[in-house]
Amino acid sequence: IVLDTMNFWMDIMLDELKDTLKLIDVLTINDEEARQLSGEYSLVKAARKILKMGPKFLVVKKGEHGALLFNQQDDVFFAPALPLEEVFDPTGAGDSFAGGFIGFLASSGDISFDNMKRAIIYGSAMASFTVEKFGTERLLDLSQEEIDARINQFVDLVQFDISIADKA
């Protein structure tokens, strides 16, 4: 069970929201909502506090700066946002991220930490398409080939080799 909540519910139904957090697998919120819910400025401290409220995983969306994934074992994963030359409208990007993320998890049936990382990349890819036009209009004519190519762009962006042992 994935919950994508917002500050509105934190403002008017905080106790009910906290009760709900005990029943879910994944909470997705943005960085400001993480700070509001936890009372912590540091996102690492915020994540630890929120995870103690019940969810097994926490995804913190940071807009054009990517997303963070935390679990109750103190594992952390960071995925950058894809640098785009043309950004027309960020409206709906967070919802597209959540839809891509949840859709990937639902299609795989796997909620392991490693698969959550893949889901974050998939969600980030969907969000990157959304900002290319107004609203969610860009998603209407999207092909699987375009999605696969965008995901490969993410992989190319973050994949590198660093060998510290060779620097002696």
Listing of model-derived features with the role each one plays in the protein:
Residues V44-A168:
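Conserved phosphate-binding/catalytic region of the ribokinase-like
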Residues I1-K49, K56, G66:
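Conserved beta-alpha-beta core of the PfkB/ribokinase-like small-molecule kinase fold
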